[in-house]
Swiss-Prot record:
Official protein name in the record: L-seryl-tRNA(Sec) selenium transferase
Enzyme class: transferase
UniProt family annotation: Belongs to the SelA family.
Pathway named in the protein's UniProt entry: Aminoacyl-tRNA biosynthesis; selenocysteinyl-tRNA(Sec) biosynthesis; selenocysteinyl-tRNA(Sec) from L-seryl-tRNA(Sec) (bacterial route): step 1/1
Any one of the GO CC terms: cytoplasm
Amino acid sequence: MTTETRSLYSQLPAIDRLLRDSSFLSLRDTYGHTRVVELLRQMLDEAREVIRDSQTLPAWCENWAQEVDARLTKEAQSALRPVINLTGTVLHTNLGRALQAEAAVEAVAQAMRSPVTLEYDLDDAGRGHRDRALAQLLCRITGAEDACIVNNNAAAVLLMLAATASGKEVVVSRGELVEIGGAFRIPDVMRQAGCTLHEVGTTNRTHANDYRQAVNENTALLMKVHTSNYSIQGFTKAIDEAELVALGKELDIPVVTDLGSGSLVDLSQYGLPKEPMPQELIAAGVSLVSFSGDKLLGGPQAGIIVGKKEMIARLQSHPLKRALRADKMTLAALEATVRLYLHPEALSEKLPTLRLLTRSAEVIQIQAQRLQAPLAAHYGAEFAVQVMPCLSQIGSGSLPVDRLPSAALTFTPHDGRGSHLESLAARWRELPVPVIGRIYDGRLWLDLRCLEDEQRFLEMLLK
């Protein structure tokens, strides 16, 4: 060991001496003596490694208390941090999908603070069913006979198949063998549910006769899967649920549908593309319809199944139901969200998802122009800050082809270096409330469709 190396090691302080320093008193009060000591030991090991490898001291050795504070502050942050979503994707899976309505937030807080009648019947003091209140609401809205709630739509499809078709065949069009995020594939789910997939037709064309020819003594279900995250266009043919139900009645085989996103209102009345609604499929005679709670519905993550009473009863009594059931917080949020649909005239005001989806391009453009001047003044030395038209997307596999006209603030580096964009995006991710945009075509884009707290946004970006 060289004299220089010994000198560097000798500059490392003892933990006891550091702890006696007044700057560590508040750290010990905030984070606890044990955690502070653990971190100091770790930092001493790091410092020794740096000395050994590069014959120098880490820069933070000049102020140990400041480094400890920075590390413990970051460590104490929740893994689920609020962010400002300016990606242009409203229902962003990585950012938690639907924002919850205030009614849902209040319902969850109440359910967390006190015991609730989750499975308790106040009328007779007996045991109730956790799905009952929501089932009644969903039946009122969709016209179904009964309903079942699980923790997401993937679970809903798994339960639906396992409870009604295990050991038997399920007939599905080849054009509907979807894969969603996380490698969730209909053929894989069928295997897990104990079903045999019987695919019919071709990728782009499936006829009623294809289903008819596939039916045999081992057929349990005819299944439709809404292709919510892709679109097949051109020379295509698919039969709708009403036609498939008619065939199912003729052959005495139930029809079930995985609707995916699911919307309880006709979105076209808000200027959005129309999506099939559960109530339409129930009216057409479909036996079971499954859909998500946290996509177009605008509620918490949940899987909802509505349909015929005898079919729902089979789902409720299946062993998987207990493993997949929703907890009290999910049920509280979902019930509060579904209740908003009883008053559709106020829905776009009270449901954040619908409010964001229906923001007009003109309103967003005005907002962008209002923000452009102060941001250009602050960032203009390095970036050209412009207002540009863009197209938002709904996200989470909903309406994959359709885009929503919007407006964005774009930041283009004067020197054209992409590394400057990456650096700027990284700086914004370190803000108290991280701002998440997207880099595309040599610019950093901030699509303002989902920006509601304009003042907070400006305060952070102008610091």
